[in-house]
Every structure is written in C-alpha cells, then in structure tokens.
Amino acid sequence: MSQYFDNVDLKSNIEKYKTRIFDKEFCFNTDNGVFSKSKLDFGTRCLLENLPLEEIKGEILEVGCGYGVIPIILTRTVDKIDSFDAVDVNKRALHLAEMNKKENFSPKVNFFLSNCYQNINKKYDVIISNPPIRAGKNIVYEIVMNARNYLKEDGKLFIVINKDQGAKSLYKDLEKVYKCELINKKKGFWIIKCILRWQLVQSMLII
C-alpha cells in the first residue's frame, strides 16, 4: 500500500478534497504517492464511525497515519484526548499531514517519521491503525501484534481490516495475545477492539 513506502520519485501534484464526518467538515491536502488521495477511504470511515469515542482519551498513537486523517478528525471531535502521536514512513504523506494539521486547527497532533514502532519510546492509552495490507502480512502483524509493547497496562488497540484481506485469520491470531471484540462488520470491513491479556503476555516473556 502506497502510504507505507516512500514514493519521492513520483511527481508531486497536490490536490484537496473536503469530507464531512461527526457533523464537521474537514479539508485535506493530498498528493501522488499517498493512500486514498481523492477521498476519505471507506475502511477509515468505518473505523472512525464505529470507535467508542468515550474510550478514546489520554495519550493516543496511530501507526501508518498517511496524511493525517484519523488524528485530525479525532482531536477535533473528542475532548478527552491529551495528545495524539501519529507516525508513517512516507515523508510526502507526513509533509501533507503537517499542512492538514494547520489547515484543520489540530494542535494536539504530533506527526513524525517511524517505520512501525521504530521511533516510538513511550506507551499509550490507545493505539489505532488501518494497517497497510498491501505492504504485506509481516508489516500488518508487526503493527497489530507489537502494539502490546506500546500500550499502557489498561491500553486498547483499535484496527480495521477487510474480510477479503485476512480479517478472520488475523482475528484468531489476535485472540492469542489480546481479549478481542468485533465491534462491527460493514461491507466486509471488520472493526476490532483489542485489550491486553496481561497474564498471557507475562508468561510469553518468561518463556
């Protein structure tokens, strides 16, 4: 998936689109070489619209943020977010994200470069991701499975994944590490909530 590769060789052609969600209008700058350049993609919309917003609070992280849709929308919508870190490996997407942060008045968001959790050195109350399926299974699993190492003791992981792209098998694997809840299914997209199974995690560390 293009947002998880650094496509600096593609000629830049910045465009804008507007979208409405949670009774608010947002404007996003996009470009060649980023995921979903012309509109808010359906999977991300499904994730946002099915999040239990009362649980999105404290310190938040998104892995694979692209041009910043999720953190910008959530910090404009949810009052109890203290800070929102958002990372990606695509420098062009991060440049757009900074533009979008200013345009949509989202001062709580901090965008920075990181290959998955490479540059992450703290733990979060909530981690959110629409993982880049086309970047490969290894990247997806690194994002969702390694999240446990970056969650606070009572932290939560929220993801969205398409049924045709392995949602069922991923859910089974997630259950080995997390207590999982299938929040909703919508047109093939599964919105999943994960809470750490601390006893299992601790036993794995001992082994």
For each feature predicted by the language model, list its residue ranges.
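N-terminal auxiliary segments of SAM/dcSAM-dependent transferases
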Residues: M1-F22, G33
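Conserved SAM-binding loop and adjacent beta-strand
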Residues: D31-L48
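Conserved SAM/SAH cofactor-binding pocket of Class I
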Residues: G43-S129
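Short beta->alpha hinge that forms the Motif I/post-I loop of the SAM-binding pocket
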Residues: D88-N90, I139, N162
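A short glycine-rich, Lys/Arg-flanked "PGG" loop and its adjoining helix->strand segment in the class I
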Residues: Y141-E153
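Conserved beta-strand signature within the Rossmann-like core of class I S-adenosyl-L-methionine
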Residues: D154-I161
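Conserved class I S-adenosyl-L-methionine
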Residues: N162-Y178
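Core SAM-dependent methyltransferase catalytic element
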Residues: K185-I207
